[in-house]
Design a protein with these regions (language model features):
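Acidic, Mg2+-coordinating active-site environments of NTP-dependent enzymes
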Residues: 50-52, 56, 74-221, 245, ...
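Conserved helix/coil segment N-terminal to the catalytic DExD/H
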Residues: 63-70
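Short beta-strand segments
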Residues: 17, 58, 81, 113, ...
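ATP-dependent carboxylate-amine ligase
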Residues: 127-129, 181-348
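Flexible beta-alpha connector loops of hexameric P-loop NTPases
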Residues: 27-37, 85-90
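Walker A (P-loop) phosphate-binding motif
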Residues: 1-21, 26
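Conserved nucleotide-sensing/catalytic segment adjacent to the nucleotide-binding pocket
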Residues: 31-60
C-alpha cells in the first residue's frame, strides 16, 4: 500500500506496523503493531512534520478494543480476514470480530475482502461507505483469470466496464486478496485503476513474509514466513506445495502466554499439509516450551509422516537442514521478520 501511494501520488508516506515504523524511508523502531495512544499521536506528529501526506497504519484488534485509535478520522479502513487468533485477549471469536469491526465506525470508506464471509460482521454498525473486493460476484473490484506462478501472481482486475492487468512479484494465493485490497484503497482515494495496477506491478515483497532464503550450494529451498495461526499456516503450506517437487517440511511452534486453543489446530494443519513436521518453540515466554509442544502434538493424529520434536529452535532448524534432501521445501513458520526468541521475559 505504501509503495502504491508513493508511486501514484509522488508523495512521502508514513508506515506504522508490526515489522517496523517508517517516516518516508527512515526506519523507526516498533514495539507493538499499533502504539499506545500518546506514542501514536507523537509518531503521527513526527510524520506530519517530516512532510508525510499519507500514513498507512496496521490497526490491531487490541488497539481497537483498548481505544488506542479513538478520535482518528481514518480516510480508508481495510479488512483482510477473520481467523482464530488472539483469543487469550478477546476470549471468543465474536468479541474478536466485534473489535475489528470498530475500525469501520472510524473510517470514511471501508474496503473489505468479500471472499471472507466475516466482512458482513465488519459492516454491522459501520458508519463508512463499503467497497467490496474479491473473486466473487459480490465484489465491485473483482479478480479474474488469476494465474499463480512460483515467483509471481498475474490477474485481470475488473471494475464495472473497466479492466486492467496486473502482475505482482509476490507468489501465493493471498497475494490476490492483498492486491485487491490495495487497489480498492487506491480507488477510494481517487487513483485510477490502471495507474494503481502499474504501481503495484513494481512492488517488492515484505521481509519475513514468504521470503526465500538464499542457500548457495544446496539443492533444497528454505522459505521463511510469519504464519502463526492455523489459517496462515494453511495458506503458506498450500502455496509452498504448489512449487515443491520433493518433500514439504514444516518447522513451527506456538507462542507462549497466548491463545492456547490454536495449538492443536496448528498441529492438525501441519499434519494434513506437510510431509515432515518439526515441532519446536516460538517465543515460549513464561511457559514451559515442552508443555506448549505437547498441546501442539495433541492435534496431530496418528500418522506415518515423520514428526520430530526439538524445543530449541536453533537446533531444530540445524537438524532440518541436515536431513533435507534434493528438491525439498523447508518452511520455517511463525517467526517471519523476528530475529529473536522470547524466553521468560527476555529477548534472546
Amino acid at each position: 500500500i505504501k509503495h502504491m501511494l508513493e508511486q501514484c501520488l509522488h508523495t512521502k508516506v508514513g508506515l506504522i506496523g508490526t515489522i517496523e515504523n517508517r517516516i518516508g524511508d527512515t526506519v523507526v523502531p516498533t514495539e507493538r503493531t499499533t502504539p499506545e495512544s500518546f506514542a501514536l499521536q507523537g509518531l503521527l506528529r513526527q510524520m506530519l512534520d517530516a512532510g508525510c501526506t499519507h500514513v498507512v497504519m496496521e490497526v490491531s484488534s487490541h488497539a481497537l478494543a483498548l481505544h488506542r485509535v479513538d478520535g482518528i478520522p481514518f480516510t480508508v479502513g481495510a479488512f483482510t480476514n477473520l481467523t482464530e487468533d488472539h483469543l487469550d485477549f478477546h476470549k471468543t471469536m465474536e468479541a474478536y470480530g466485534a473489535a475489528k469491526a470498530r475500525l469501520f465506525r472510524l473510517c470514511r470508506t471501508g474496503v473489505l475482502n468479500a471472499d471472507d464471509p466475516a466482512y458482513r460482521t465488519m459492516l454491522q454498525g459501520a458508519a463508512c461507505t463499503p467497497l467490496l473486493v474479491g473473486t466473487g460476484k459480490d465484489a465491485a473490484l473483482r479478480a479474474e483469470q488469476v494465474q499463480l506462478a512460483p515467483d509471481h501472481v498475474a490477474m485481470e482486475v475488473r471494475e464495472g466496464e473497466k479492466a486492467a492487468h496486473v502482475r505482482i512479484g509476490i507468489p501465493g494465493r493471498f497475494t490476490v486478496s492483498n492486491a485487491l485490497l490495495t487497489l480498492g484503497i487506491a480507488r477510494a482515494l481517487g487513483i485510477g485503476l490502471e495507474d494503481a495496477c502499474r504501481a503495484l506491478g513494481t512492488a517488492a515483497g515484505v521481509k519475513g513474509r514468504i521470503e526465500v532464503v538464499p542457500t548457495p550450494g544446496r539443492d533444497y529451498t528454505v522459505l521463511i514466513d510469519y504464519a502463526h495461526t492455523p489459517d496462515a499456516l494453511e495458506n503458506i503450506l498450500t502455496t509452498a506445495r504448489d512449487f515443491t517437487a520433493g518433500r514439504l517440511i514444516c518447522v513451527f511452534g506456538c507462542g507462549g502466554d497466548r491463545d492456547r486453543g490454536k495449538r492443536p489446530l496448528m498441529g492438525a494443519v501441519a499434519a494434513e499439509l506437510a510431509d515432515v513436521l518439526v515441532v519446536t518453540s516460538d517465543n515460549p515466554r513464561t511457559e514451559e516450551p515442552m508443555a506448549i509442544i505437547r498441546e501442539i502434538l495433541a492435534g496431530i493424529p496418528q500418522t506415518e509422516k515423520p514428526v520430530y520434536v526439538e524445543k530449541n529452535r536453533r537446533r531444530a532448524i540445524r537438524m532440518t537442514l541436515r536431513f533435507a534432501q534434493k528438491d525439498d521445501m523447508i518452511v520455517l513458520a511463525g517467526k517471519g521478520h523476528e530475529t529473536y526468541q522470547v524466553l521468560g521475559t527476555e529477548k534472546i
